[in-house]
Each structure stands twice: as structure tokens, then as C-alpha cells.
Amino acid sequence: MFDQHKIEKAVRLILEAIGENPEREGLKGTPARVARMYEEIFSGLQEDPEEHLQKIFSEEHEEMVIVKDIPLYSICEHHLLPFYGKAHVAYIPRKGKVTGLSKLARVVEGFAKRPQLQERLTSQIADTIMRRLNPIGVLVVIEAEHMCMTFRGVKKPGSKTVTSAVRGLFRKNVATRAEAFSLIKGQA
């Protein structure tokens, strides 16, 4: 459950702890703005992304389906700083059972909009698709830049973290996996 009042109090305390005056003109509304922002960027905590995959269609298609370059924005749970990038989702329908393409993007967003680790995010997307659609295989790749590596600490802007989760036929069959990676890279 989202507690806007508690977040506002916490932001006020942080501002005081860094030596700022939360009552000065530029900061007066900041605790409320931050609370509203957190409600938006952590909205995935209020949903079950699997629900986006309830609608399944029967099609004469048992070949690879890829939705690539899905923009994603999340918050690293270690420093509460953003990471952002792209998700690529591939699956091979079993017996022609497909879902709407936008539903795959909604699953990505539902898991991204919460405190996250990129590795977990990648697996959660793949496991949810595998569980709900029961496809022959699923492959998820996420490429993201982490502000905790860009803005602080090691300060390496432009560095990207790439994670993958490979399930079913994509894990078992090297050629199928290679085809998916090639299509994701745009080398079809």
C-alpha cells in the first residue's frame, strides 16, 4: 500500500539531514512532488504483471515472435537511482497460442516500475511469459544504463549492462537462440 504522507515526511527529513531548509521557496512543495513521483515510478508494486497476459488468441503461427526495443525505466533497489534502456522479448507460441504484442510491453513495464535489479527484472519477465503463455521457448534481453554507475561511484557514463533470460527451446537449441539474438541485433 502506498503511503504518500510517510514519503513526504521522509523527504523532508532527508532535506533537513543534508542541511537544506524544506520550507524555503524552491523546496516547499518538493516532499509532495517526490511522493507523487514515487507513486508513479513504483506503480508496478500495485499490479500483477501476469494479468496482462490473460487474453490469449489462437493463430496459425508457431514461429518466433519478437518485440524489441521496448523502452524501460526502473529504479535500482541498491541506491534508488534510475536505470533505463531497452527490453527485447522473444517467444515461440505453442499450438498457435499468442498474446497481443502490447501485452508483452505491459509485462516489462509492470515489473520495471518497482525497486529492481536488472537481473531479477529479466528473469521475472521471462518466467511470467513462460508460466502464462506456456510457449515452446522465451528469450528476454535487457540493455540498460545505470545511474548508480554513471552519476556516482565509478562514474562510467555510457556503459551498458546486458542481461538475458533464456527458457525452453531457446536454451536447448543453439541455432534458435542464435536466430533470436541475430534478429534482436537487427541482422536478419
UniProtKB/Swiss-Prot annotation:
Q: In which pathway does it act?
A: Cofactor biosynthesis; 7,8-dihydroneopterin triphosphate biosynthesis; 7,8-dihydroneopterin triphosphate from GTP: step 1/1
Q: Which UniProt keywords apply?
A: GTP-binding, Hydrolase, Metal-binding, Nucleotide-binding, One-carbon metabolism, Zinc
Give one GO biological process term: tetrahydrofolate biosynthetic process
Top-tier EC class = hydrolase
One GO molecular function term of this record is:
GTP cyclohydrolase I activity
Its domain of life reads Bacteria
Subunit info here reads: Homomer.
- The molecule here is called GTP cyclohydrolase 1
Its gene name is folE
